[in-house]
Amino acid sequence: MGKPNIYLFPQLSDNYGYFIKNPHATEGVLIDPSDYDMCLKILELNDSKASHILITHHHEDHIAAVDKIRNKFNSTVIGYSQDDQIPKPDLPVDEGQIFEIHGQKYEVIHTPGHTLQHINYFIKDHNILFSGDTLFNTGCGRMFEGDPKMFWKSLSKIKSLPLDTKIYCGHEYTLSNIKFALSIDPDNQDLVKLADWVNQQEDEHRPTIPTTLKEQIHCNPFLRCDSEYFFRYYDSKEPDQIFAKMRSAKDNF
């Protein structure tokens, strides 16, 4: 199956939703629909219906429109089998499970940390990741339910994906993330270059998504907790402890 089209659209204040469909198709997949009207607009623009809905986690700003869309389009809802706080999935899925929608194969990656039941979806044949609130451009989600060891393990799973993986996350937080990253890694020239681009995108009211895993490994401090630089910076060689200190610093930045 050829590469699907991915349509990013804004929801609420700073959320992103995604509509995935194959070229010339009239149905596709919505990810984390929270703004019903915006979801209808993106579907209408593409003369399509939502055959499926994928849920990454149970926070209201990622699921608020799920039931209304399911009722309107008879959509198949897919979500983590262990998350009893999401709308009841028609297809419950688990870590490592692979399922197919419209010829595209999706792999489920369990990424606890932001919530205990958070999952990512990876389109295997095209190296496309929908990371929800686990990984952002130059940042990561707040640690509401997990612990540092758990969250670092989740990020390490993402780090093991192919370097050309395109990452589509749940929020436009990049500008604030960049400011924090520069405060602890000011001499990182890859980060400085990315910051220039992010500022330009912000000035032009353009999204900073998607990013790539290669770019994030160079620029995202939360993926670099196992680097020599942060070993020295935090005087530790334990990545999960470094992550804990870094996440706390970002929370208070």
State each model region's role.
Residues 28, 35-108, 193-197, 201:
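Active-site HxH/HxHxD metal-binding segment of metal-dependent hydrolases
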Residues 31, 77-79, 130-131, 169:
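Hydrophobic residues in well-ordered beta-strands that form the structural core
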Residues 20, 32, 57, 69, ...:
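Divalent metal-coordination and catalytic microenvironments
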Residues 1-46, 120-132:
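Conserved beta-strand hairpin/beta-sheet module of binuclear metal-dependent hydrolase folds
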Residues 19, 98-124, 128-129, 160:
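Core dinuclear metal-dependent hydrolase active-site scaffold
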Residues 33-35, 58, 82-83, 114-115, ...:
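Active-site metal-binding loops of divalent metal-dependent hydrolases
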Residues 139-165:
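Active-site-adjacent loop/tail segments of enzyme domains
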